[in-house]
From Swiss-Prot:
Keywords: Cytoplasm, Glycosyltransferase, Methylation, NAD, Nucleotidyltransferase, Nucleus, Phosphoprotein, Ribonucleoprotein, Transferase
Entry protein name: Protein mono-ADP-ribosyltransferase PARP4
Region described as Interaction with the major vault protein: spans on this chain: 1808-1969
Gene that this sequence comes from: Parp4
Sequence positions bearing Phosphoserine: S1229
Domain of life, per lineage: Eukaryota
Amino acid sequence: MTLGIFANCIFCLKVKYLPRQQKKKLQTDIKENGGKFSFLLNPQCTHVIVDSADVLSRCHLNSIQKNDVQIANPAFIQDSVRQRRLLDVRNYDPLSPAPAAPPAERSRSEVQSEYLPSDNTPEKENTEVTEVSAENVEIPPFLQDFEVVKYNILEKVGGPETVVVELQSSQDPESCPFVITAHFLLADQKTRRESTGKQTSEGAIEYYESYVEDLKRQGFLLQEHFTAEATQLASEKLQALLLEEVISSGALSQEVSDLLEVIWTEALGHLENTLLKPVNSMSLNDVSKAEGILLLVKTALKNGDSPGQLQKTMAEFYRLLPHRHPASEEVNLRLLAQKEDLCQLVRDMVNVCETNLSKPNPPSLAKYRALRCKIEHVDQNTEEFSRVRKEVLQNNRSEQPVDILQIFRVGRVNEATEFLSKLGNVRLLFHGSPVRNILGILSRGLLLPKVAEDRGVQRTDVGNLGSGIYFSDSLSTSIKYAHAGETDGSRLLVVCDVALGKCVNLFKKDFSLTEAPPGYDSVHGVSETTSVPTDFQDDEFVVYKTNQVKMKYIVKFCTPGDQIKEFHPHENTEVEEQRAEPSSVPEAGDFQLPDIKPFTNIKAGLQDASANPVPLDSVHIKGRVIDFVAQVIVFQTYTNQSHVPIEAKYIFPLDDKAAVCGFEAFINGKHIVGEIKEKEEARQEYREAVSQGHGAYLMDQDTPDVFTVSVGNLPPRAKVLIKITYITELSIQSPVAIFFIPGTVAPWQQDKALNENLQDTVETIRIKEIGAEQSFSLAMSIEMPYMIEFISSDTHELRQKSTDCKAVVSTVEGSSLDSGGFSLHIGLRDAYLPRMWVEKHPEKESEACMLVFQPELADVLPDLRGKNEVIICLDCSSSMEGVTFTQAKQVALYALSLLGEEQKVNIMQFGTGYKELFSYPKCITDSKMATEFIMSAAPSMGNTDFWKVLRYLSLLYPSEGFRNILLISDGHLQSESLTLQLVKRNIQHTRVFTCAVGSTANRHILRTLSQCGAGVFEYFNSKSKHSWKKQIEAQMTRIRSPSCHSVSVKWQQLSRDAPEPLQAPAWVPSLFHNDRLLVYGFIPHCTQATLQAFIQEKEFCTMVSTTELQKTTGTMIHKLAARALIRDYEDGILHDDETNHEMKKNIMKSLIIELSKENSLITQFTSFVAVEKRDVNEIPFANVPNISELVAKEDVDFLPYVSWQEKQPEASISQTEIDSSRLKHNKLSDGHGVLQPVSVSSEVNEKPSLLLAAKKRKIKTIKKCSLDISEDFEDRTAVAQSPATAQSLNFHLPLSVRPQLKAVEQQLHGNRLEPKQRGGFRKLLMAKKCRNVPDSLVSSAPAVTAEFSYLSACSSSSAFLSPLCDIPSSLPPHPLGGTHPPPPLPLPDGTHLPSPLFGSTHPPPPLFGGTLIPPPSSLFGGTHLPPPPPLPGGTHIPPPPPIPGGTLIPPSSSLFGGTHLPPPPLLSAGTHIPPPPLLSAGTHLPPPPLLPAGTHIPPPPPITGSTHPPPPSSLFGGTHLPPPPPLPGGTHIPPPPPIPGGTLIPSPSSLFGGTHLPPPPLLPAGTHIPPPPPITGSTHPPPPSSLFGGTHLPPPPPAGTQFSLSPIGFIPPKLGPPKLSHSHKLVGDTNIHDSEPPLLGFKDLCSRDMGFSCGTAFSGSFASSKDFDPGKFSQGPNNISFSPKAPEMGVLHQSPFCSPPKPPSAPPLVTNVLCSEAPQSYFLNLQSAAVHQSPNNRVSEIIMESVESSLPSDYSSRDASSYLALEGAEDSLLGGSSFETDTDEAAAFIANDLLTSIETSSDEECAFCDEDQESPVPWASLFALQTENGFWKLTPELGLILNLNVNALLTSLEEKGIRSLGTKGRERLLDLIATLLVLQFLYTKLEQEGMVAKSLIKMDDAFISRNIPWAFENIKKAREWARKTEGQYPSICQRLELGKDWESATKQLLGIQPQANTSLHRILYYSQG
């Protein structure tokens, strides 16, 4: 192998001034000869090739000298290659000036001279002209690949000098972007060229303008036309552009004139002989539709449709293009090819006629100019004629001679500019075509065939190489296509330059080709020879791009068989006179757009044809809003005041987003329902019904915003109710959705609809509904995917009620609907988050999807408003003449008025050419010039060559920001494909917004332009001018905002065989800031879709999904999806090619009609029709429709359990707020976080003084983080000693949470406690969670805090409900609140001390270790309470059902040792003790022993099974209630039946009844009691510790006393249930109707609110977490069971024994788990009824003293019974499903004053909390509940640890539809929620210890392993399980309204970051059990 001459040589190329092509040749020469090259100088280089010495820096020279590198100029390479040897570099010294290298000082402004004088010295003036640039830009001598942007020719006055100035835009990315060149022709016929480069288009234009102005100052003048000498100065690219100049200015020879007349006559004559209508009266839109029909027939022909079906489809083609003799021949490919050629010919003729104002036979010169093609005759005596003739004839392979008659040189402008000559391999080839087609070919060039195999069907090799442009190199082949003309008998051949580029030879046919194979530019079908067999008879060359073709000649020839005729056209070669311009330019005021609201001068009400008012009786509207869509039902009632039957027409106005989907009428007791039928069928049925005397109703949609209802034969004096249902989309303004109902009709729509006569039988009275003012009502439901921020109306006063995501609004009484309509504004949170809705059809297997996408672009993209350009392009072509051009000016002027002074603007008029206001966009400070430029425009600029404007602007692309083109046109563009190519090519910097004007506008091409150009299309319909301003404003707003374009949707389809998704819109338009996209689709079993879009040329992708949970059932989205498909059919883009678009429309027509019928939607093809059969003997208006009843049937109130939010006076309570039948609360924020109550109980209204006092009472507030407590408790409580003051103090508004600290300070106005004290008080008061206290749910029960225990059974919730509790209402000063020392501690022997704190003669509660211990007598009441009233219907309380598990509970004597049990010893510090023994009735209970610091008291066990409510005294606990009558038959309640499992429950007498028990002994310090045995399954009862959750005492000996149970607390033996009214049922009472729900008593309130004390431990549990099914707890009150699942729960608060060992460095974590409340299961039977709940109902864990202290002294049992009765009534109303009972109302007013008693014990509480702060987290209990797989179950045990109301959460999830996930899906989701809650709980605790982590799933493993290594693997396993499972439920958190994501949801559930007015806030804060 021979080595190259440059082997082992590495050349460093430093050729700065060498042209690009020479640089490439240099590189190629080096590589082909074995060398290598580099652009960097390195030690490996052997040679440096430089073209000028100035390119080498000092550093380069040092390196060259150091490494001994040889230097040479480029000639060294060229000569070495030529001589095939490596030459000596010394002969190519680069230091000597190279001939091609310019001087160094001219690197900025280059001057090149050709034929300069001998001294080579340029003239001084020319040098000065060029020294303008200041940019450091390398400028090549000549741009090789460029386009000419601007050019001018100037001649010097008085001298022969000429200069051509060009602004060139480089197409080479490596070259200078813009170059300004000036080519001078000097006086001595020598030339000189100057060039300057610029980097930006703005700089280039400014320099160009400045350069031309400088030439003018030097004496040069601008010239309009190029002379022959000046043309030689132009660049090759400019000479191609000058073809346009030659066409416009050149004279027309006789030969060219004759040719034009021949091809014109041939084309026009063919059309006249074929078509029935003249071509100038045809619409291009009809041509496009006809082409679509042909494509549809072609497809049907391929599919084998029957001939009858084909003929039926072709009939539509003949309707669009009427023929003189419709073809009756068989439909085949040949016929279709002929008709396609006919359509193209019609299109060509219409376009040509546009230039000549549609004149049928313009003069020859006008025809010539209309073709826009240069045609020159080539004389036969020239060398060019001989050369072309020879090339044509030499390839004639047939034996038939051909006679060349004439040759014409042709050239088209866009072919010259777009021709891809750089592909190479340019050959002269032939294309034959019939003479009638030559007119179109010259006008628009050769086009790709629409159907390749339709070309020349007579040939055997039709479409052999697919869909391309076919050429041949043989005349004999082209003759087959070049048919002789009928005018003169000659044939025409098109000779073209074809850039074949890299051509592939094929020997087999390939019909599927639509482009050249990869790597090739063209295809050559090789003809068959004897040696090479192929499929081709002739050589065929095929290209697939029109810009590979450039026409050069038209050859006129004939064959021996042709008969040449003499043709003498009419001599008319002169151009017609130009139209006279208008004498005066119209003023801008003449083009003002009408106002947006044109209804101000229209009368309101109904009117007949004589304008007599016919008042509308009433208008009622019911609506349903879901997300951004709505369904509205309108009831219109009116009466025929005439004495004769009439046909009335009713005009129903709507916006263009609406679609009617239902029409009904009620008249004379009849209900007529409209049916959708095809329009003609409906009208025929209507006419027949009217003629037969029947009633008939017809509803049409003539325009998008007007529906007409024709009511035929309306009887005299008849009242008619018309019910119209429609669907619509809401408009969007930022995050606000706007729903609007118009109150008037567009006047320009009324006349046409009213004047149309449908029947001739009865009188027609035309009615215009202009807005009914007499009677109007509206009610709407609103459902949003995210939180509703606000709801308001600027037209009407509303009342409303709402939850987070749902609301109901209605107008107030007395509202009216005037011409302003009705407007509703809905503020949304997170409106920018995409979402997906799926709806199942209730009656068939169908699913409709809706995607909502509203990108928040303003926050993502920078504001480029000041950098953007706006170019207003006004179409001034001839087709715009008339009213269309007036409308275009109106649009342009209004758009101009909306542009600010800081906006860069330019205005361009275009037709065949273009004119611009400025040479480049400028800021307009004065719009006068711009306005005059628009006003002076006239539709006389010829064709619509918008591509020239696009090309010009694309060459001058903006350096920064966007260019926004606003195109105002009728859309009849020339060169559509080229125009679209230019738009797509420049999308990165240019956006195209299109405005269609005129009734015949080509909306498809304009819509496609905007779609491809990242803009938006608007059609300005002359029938809806009232919306024009809004449309223009919308376009200008989009122009100023960032955009998101090329949006596409990909639907997830599980089956590969699934049909193509039916989506609307098929082509998604571009989106802008605040734009909202709704995409509909009929896609079965689809739960996921992907949205893709481009923002600033970066692709973004987002996925939206839903689950079975989110799928709804109904027809609303189905109707919306059908409506969207119909709209897309009418106005959308089904395909970018117009022919295919029309074909798809024809295919979809039947589908559209079917969708219309199925969904009752009016379309352009269908109408509503209803016929009312009438009998001549029927009595007129015998049954007047009951309007109110019909309206009431449409109930949209889906929040019946929420009351209306209404304003009320400050100091009084109105009657409307007191409703005894339904007592509910909904709160309105006052702006400061305080929730104000709206309504109160009617029972409370019986004591107005209490309510007024409550109203005036200041609301106490609680701050979560800090709380200032006043110390003037003495002053505040001293006043309460009197009954009057006690009454006023104890009844005030409910306690609410206010976050402002100053409000607390102002109300309490006391000295601040120390921070530590405040913190302790906060924890005591808030139970470590600050909760809102809604008034409707605050319990009036005695309070127990999570950190406060009583040393008695009263420490349990049930004990608090005891009727024996005796705590007075008045409270003394706090014992530790003042300056005096605390009282002495109680003695161990039980010595009594005075206790004013508890208001009795018994000793005060002992205080030890921060624990208040009230005396048992004060807690249990001793003998102070009278017996309860007897039970109605019997003397015995029915026994409760058995407890599951089979355990028998012995009597209290056996349980607690009877009266012989000695008192327990005193406990030392840290010891947990059980409650004292409970004795039988009659025993006096002494004060309990003292507890050491830190002692925790357990609560009693939760017991279920009783079916009786407590007595009133147990509900309100006071000792001042009158005694109820005794129970008949004795004082003892009969024993209950055995509890399931055999357990006997002790009687309350044994629990609470004793009075003489001596104080129990104190246990020594450190004493521990062994744990009790489990309950379930045992034959013995559990010890007290197991029931009360305290310390572990040994089980006591059995005894015999029994006791009864109640679902709401213990019922003492001497007390029966309260007497209730006959309408309420006692639980378990068989004498009352079973249908009524169980009664919830006051215990329900306590159990929700208070929970257990700090010492509570949950000893019982479910058998396993798997056995726990929250859904089972809503079955009834008697199905709760307990089992000893986790014994560690019994010692939950013995943290030293529970917590695992930890490293010494890690201190124990502080947690609120130690303050756990009552087990959830204890109250599940009560709380399970809470199906519905008020949005803000959540009760704070507050400290409450006894009920008695909250009630006035004169509060009677009647009041308590009233509350019970109300509660029962409420439960009856709501089916026992609501917590918003009247007892809640009562509790709201009772509980608030309990803060007084809270304040009196702050010091002790603070001391207690200080102790509690050191309590560690019960880690062992928490991780004991974790499953093997790592997750937790959502059980009450877990809820107890997390301080979470599990049942409330489960109830809410059930309401949200969690069961739709299925059993497994539901359980798995509950496990996920539980696990995430635990992880959030751990995350928060670890974060307090200093851990830093991103999220609850991404914790710091290192930190966890250091601090709690024993739990590291458990936490890791949980995180991995949660991460995997979370992905299976995308967006489920939002669907269930839990929050934005799991992070925020879990924080809210745990109270870490509570948020008011959220779903979770209301779910969990109403009941913390």
